[in-house]
Amino acid sequence: MIESNLLVLTLVIPILTAILLIFIGKRPIIKRYVALVGTLLTLVIALINLKNVLRDGPIKVELGSWKAPYSIVFVVDIFSALLIITSIIITILVILYSYRSIGLDRERHYYYFSIMFMLIGIIGSFTTGDIFNLFVFFEVFLMSSYCLLVIGTTKIQLQETIKYILVNVVSSSFFVMGVAVLYSVVGTLNLAHISERLSQLSVHDSGLVNIVFILFIFVFATKAGVFPMYVWLPGAYYAPPVAIITFFGALLTKVGVYAIARTLSLFFNNTVSFSHYVILFLALLTIIFGCIGAIAYYDTKKIILYNIMIAVGVILVGIAMMNESGMTGAIYYTLHDMLVKASLFLLIGVMYKITKTTDLRHFGGLIKGYPILGWTFFIAALSLAGIPPFSGFYGKFYIVRATFEKGFYLSGIIVLLSSLIVLYSVIRIFLKGFFGEVEGYTLSKKVNVKYLTTIAVASTVITVIFGLSADTLFPIIKDGAETFVDPSQYIHSVLGGK
């Protein structure tokens, strides 16, 4: 009972924090600390939840005094617990970074409120046990993201927000259609119950299941920024301030990735044989087009944004394999990418603060005035590229191993080659931005970026610790992968369990 209450608290605390932020009014200093304390409390509860999951297996809570599959169910397993903890850590870093970067005008209004509600939507998406509430939590974090995109009301923000809203309204409509078709086939919305019902379907209903798969893959691939539904991502994520880009780039696409992994495991593991091939095909195209974008631009933000696409593609290759190696690599690489992308965006934000530009052709020589910033970026770049012993190596190694175990040798080779493109793209930023002639800033008039650099360095240190802790983490992550490869444990914990 206590464990169930703790699971609910990961949603209740951010909700109460958001409500309190409304009543505080236009007092940004107080809002800063309320948002920070609320997020720290949520992190403590999330860590306790992880400890309970490691001890007892997946934990569920049923709301409304009804039993599953008729109740509203929230479930946390190892993967969702790790995603929640990582999301909260990144939220804390973004809040701290915002103190000196986002501006008092934004802070006075609904900035921290929107961050809290986006965190609610993300945590809810990772823990909900039914498909309709997944839609609800998607809408919660999407509406919060709309608010964050327009805060500041610059022309480019408004332009990109309109596109972003349009794309997501269309995908949300398809989501509702998919839920309706699925319910007409199986008569339930509970994820675990849907899995059981789909395994009992006759061949006659397989056509409708194919339609459901197409609808869901369109929706989740759009959220994750998968080719060809990625077109909104570079513009929408480029427009807002760096603190918001960090929040979006590190977290939002991973919600779509998680939804693909969970539904593929529960709904389509055995029912739709071509589903894994479709996801693999889209994943490889996403990697290829992400690589093209990463080397085509001189803008530092766009280079990292296209690296988001590459990472999403690599993760989906592991998910498409749906074996122990593939899912272990996908889980580890997802957590790694969330942390390292946050680090890189925060570092680029510091570089922008100094030079007032993100165009590599217009600045250089930063290492002379800001050596700590430069070498921290170098470490984050190596981690992103997957150079051992940093965290990017281990997840990618398991994903490539999974492709070879399944006989998808070309897929494994594409993943390996993408590492070279990633390394080239980020080392280009390092060499052009930090070496060469001093340009874009005055060496004798250094900009005070100590606070922002400290937050960015802290973020990178967390990434490095994550990589160096691989031996400790992998047994845990392998247990989390088993829930996807063999979802019976998840199903039992929801329908038969605790």
UniProtKB/Swiss-Prot annotation:
Please verify whether the record's keywords include Iron-sulfur: no
UniProt keywords (A-Z) are: Antiport, Cell membrane, Hydrogen ion transport, Ion transport, Membrane, Sodium, Sodium transport, Transmembrane, Transmembrane helix, Transport
Q: Name one Pfam family in it.
A: Proton_antipo_M
Q: How does it sit in the membrane?
A: Multi-pass membrane protein
**InterPro entries documented for this protein:** CPA3_Na-H_Antiporter_D (IPR050586), NADH_UbQ_OxRdtase (IPR003918), ND/Mrp_TM (IPR001750)
Name a single GO cellular component: plasma membrane
Entry's localization field: Cell membrane
Query: Which is a GO BP term held by this UniProt record?
Result: ATP synthesis coupled electron transport
Q: Name one GO molecular function term.
A: NADH dehydrogenase (ubiquinone) activity
Primary location recorded for the protein, binned into one broad class: membrane
Q: Which residues cross the membrane?
A: 5-25, 34-54, 72-92, 109-129, 131-151, 174-194, 211-231, 232-252, 277-297, 303-323, 331-351, 370-390, 407-427, 457-477
User: What does the subunit section of this Swiss-Prot or TrEMBL entry state?
Assistant: May form a heterooligomeric complex that consists of seven subunits: mnhA1, mnhB1, mnhC1, mnhD1, mnhE1, mnhF1 and mnhG1.
Family membership noted in the UniProt record:
Belongs to the CPA3 antiporters (TC 2.A.63) subunit D family.
Q: What does this protein do, in the record's words?
A: Mnh complex is a Na(+)/H(+) antiporter involved in Na(+) excretion.
Q: What is this protein called?
A: Na(+)/H(+) antiporter subunit D1
Output the lineage of the source organism. Answer: Bacteria, Bacillati, Bacillota, Bacilli, Bacillales
Gene (UniProt): mnhD1
